Amino acid sequence: MADRQLSSASSSRRQKQPTDGAVGQFVIDKEIGKGSFAQVYSGRHKVTGALVAIKSVELSRLNKKLKENLYGEIKILKTLRHPHIVALHDCVESATHINLIMEYCELGDLSLFIKKREKLITHSATRDIARRYPIEHNQGLHEVITRHFLKQLASALKFLREGNFVHRDVKPQNLLLLPSPLFRETHHSAKQILSASYDSLMPAAGLPSLPMLKLADFGFARVLPSTSLAETLCGSPLYMAPEILRYERYDAKADLWSVGTVLYEMATGRPPFRAGNHVELLRKIEAAEDQVKFPRESVVSPELKSLVRALLKRNPVERISFADFFNHTVITGPIPNLHEDDLPKPEPQQVKETVRPEGSLSLSRRDSQRGKAATGVLSSPRPRPSSPLATPIEKPNPLEQVPGPRAGLSYSPAGDGLGITRRPAVQPSTSAPARPVMYVDRSRANSTASQRPPRESIVPDPSQTLASQPRPKSRPTKPLTEEEKAAQDVALERDYIFIDKKGVEVNALADQISMYPQSVPKSGQIVRRATQQGHPTSTTGAVSARNNHLRQGSYDKPLSSSPGSTTSAISKAIQDASLRLFGFNVAPHLLSKGQSPPQIYSPFPAYPTPSAPAGLISDGKHTTPVDEDSRVAQCIEDWATRSDVVYGFAEVKYKQLVPLAPSMDYGLGGVPADKMEEEDGLTLEATVSLSEEALVLYVKALSLLAKSMDIASLWWTRKSRSDNSNSIHSAARDSVNSQALALKINRVVQWIRSRFNEVLEKAEIVRLKLIEAQKQLPEDHPSHPSNHQTEVSSVTGAEGVILSPGISAEKLMYDRAVEMSRTAAINEIASEDLPGCEIFYSTAIRMLEAVLDSDDDHLPKRRISTSSRDEKAEAAVREDTSEMSSEDKQSIQKMIQMVKARLANLQKKMLAISRAQQQQQQDIISVRRRSGEMAPRSVPV
């Protein structure tokens, strides 16, 4: 639902939220739209945080007829469960308001989509669509998109006709849009939406890569058998059937006229008939005499034109029937001119069907729908156990369906409707992040994994039994390595869902801390039911889930494919820069053992309840909790500041690649077209180089942010434990200073969460851009994928990223720090821009500290069990591959101390200058006062 500003003429009572910030089990956020008699707010579930739309109607403003329409809408929506109809979750009535809790549709309505069709490239959820199906100037939507939406609208209308419903107000404003299922399941930035049933977010028709359409606003809908006629004037005049405008009796075919007007507007970008009132509109319809003309500039296929003309017949008898409409080739046939990414991929469905257990009918229906959605064919009905939450696929009478008492609040934890996802092959870690192979609603997992209700509380569904049943093999696969087999065996032991683990940890921890100190946690641990340890697989943080007892046996290899040359290049650069700036050489083997990117945000520490303070957080002295909180806050801020410095450096690269960074500030529009062409000036080699540099820097920033969250996790665990115990520090814990520090930590954690999610998205954009640019290089180019078949083949089931030799975050950061220090030194000598010099020195220090980053710097040193060879080997490998030698650290630390000395001298110099200026100003003021005392005064002192 598109955001709209409140009218200045609206009364304060209309602008006021219906309750004190909550309606039933939902919290009201902000107003996102309004109608003649209702306001629409975005809201979220108190427990899961899933988004909903809350339609709040003030009863005092409704007359008897409008109240009947409202209660009729509620009655109808309670009985309807279809993927392409906006579902009603709940209805909460108070003394002054009726609040309808409905599905949230992030992309607004179809009218906004059509209006902003030339600016879809600026929205993250529609950017890929605009690239695959570009829209020419002064034309409507691309025909592929038009047919896709028409198929989904037809699916909703077919369901309504089976229940003898007529909507009577089909128009673009009542057709709401969600991001495509593929976008929701592969992008962490997608918002988590509360689903009404297991398949309410799974399209029944169309393409899974395009936005999902849902029919809304049943205020004028009614049950109307095919033999009955109605005579009420309702709906929007611009899309009304002529028989309604003539005040004649009408039947369900009135909806077909409205479908024709919507289809015409999608194809051309404008409605077929424009008028200021319904009388003038009727006159224009009559004058056209069924001759529907299309603009010359619009490219519309003859098949689509024929369907529009069949729908826009003045006489309902001559108008196409529902049966013919639902069986029309545009509805039932495949969508032509599909992009290669949307072409249907053949799957051995018959083999799967023959071995599928009987209890998995709902899953086979889902697979069937997905397979047919690519070709645009409606799914064929399959018998299955009836459920009040399920989409009726037989011919039901909706009025006879009685939903359960809380049926509207059914929630699918998996994100794509069934609560079950296909388990991906376990992927070994690689030199660069790889694309996740999970098909999961990652946004949903991000904020609800730690708060997911027990499985026993979920409404029983036949598909749930699949989680524990062995899955038959559908086709032969290549042999797995021993490590992959072991990882898969352990993964199959758990009845959990594969999720973006690190993103979940960051968001879940931030959610937990955000509730403090408003409510004291009831447990000493952070609940992480659906999160496991695993290997990093992509810059977006997706990881393969595995049991906690399965230790990681391999480590990320350095990004360079030729370690010798890389070390030489880095060492030479460091020595030359150090000699120029500081007059001494750094050890030649500096950073030779470092990783870039490091082991990406190594799995969240396997110490949910540590028994001792973390090494970095505690100095071994016995101090009060307040002092400890102060150290924690400072430590978290330090790591966050280092990540911010690296992020700023990565942004320099990113903005050269994407001149206008994706931003929700622009919504679906607002980006000048000329700015979108700036990236065309980059050569392929430059694009590859910038993408590689931006990628490793973003990954480095992510690792630093993850360390901040690790420290916050330890603090939060200890804080939660102390809150549930009668410790001697209970008084200090409740002190004002302690609460203030906790709030400070909370603010920092929320900032880290926001930055973490932003960097994940940008890293994925850069990764895709890098892969695309590498494919366009000449085949003999060293960076072309064909020259790295060995490396790429090691990434199971994912598209690997191969970086050029010599690319590492540490080298880039070191060179940048040296450059900034040198520039600051030159300006300091010339006494130019001293505040800028201070910023440059501080940034260089933070960047060099980030170069010194070690995965275990901030973590407690855990003992190595003498009875576990694996743990000993793991510790040895970590010490050999992840940590710098003491000589390397001393060299960098010496450099940091020298830059700090320069910074201290600069600050003293700036302080002296400031004091001199203040003294000079005071002297001037005193002179003026003395001169003023000698002048005659008109007012006595």
Curated annotation (Swiss-Prot):
Bias (Polar residues) occurs at 530-551
Localization: Cytoplasm; Preautophagosomal structure membrane
Active site (record annotation): D169
Q: Which GO terms describe its molecular function?
A: ATP binding; protein serine kinase activity; protein serine/threonine kinase activity
Binding-site residues for ATP, renumbered to this chain: I32, G33, K34, G35, S36, F37, A38, Q39, V40, K55
Q: Which GO terms describe its cellular component?
A: autophagosome; cytosol; phagophore assembly site membrane
Q: Which keywords annotate this record?
A: ATP-binding, Autophagy, Cytoplasm, Kinase, Membrane, Nucleotide-binding, Protein transport, Serine/threonine-protein kinase, Transferase, Transport
Give the enzyme's EC designation.
Answer: 2.7.11.1
Q: Which CDD domains match?
A: STKc_ATG1_ULK_like
Asked if the record carries the keyword Nucleus, the reply is no
- Specify the protein's topology with respect to the membrane: Peripheral membrane protein
The record, for Gene3D superfamilies, names: Transferase(Phosphotransferase) domain 1
Q: How does it assemble?
A: Homodimer. Forms a ternary complex with ATG13 and ATG17.
Any idea what job this protein has?
Serine/threonine protein kinase involved in the cytoplasm to vacuole transport (Cvt) and found to be essential in autophagy, where it is required for the formation of autophagosomes. Involved in the clearance of protein aggregates which cannot be efficiently cleared by the proteasome. Required for selective autophagic degradation of the nucleus (nucleophagy) as well as for mitophagy which contributes to regulate mitochondrial quantity and quality by eliminating the mitochondria to a basal level to fulfill cellular energy requirements and preventing excess ROS production.
Q: What is this protein called?
A: Serine/threonine-protein kinase ATG1
Q: Which gene encodes it?
A: ATG1
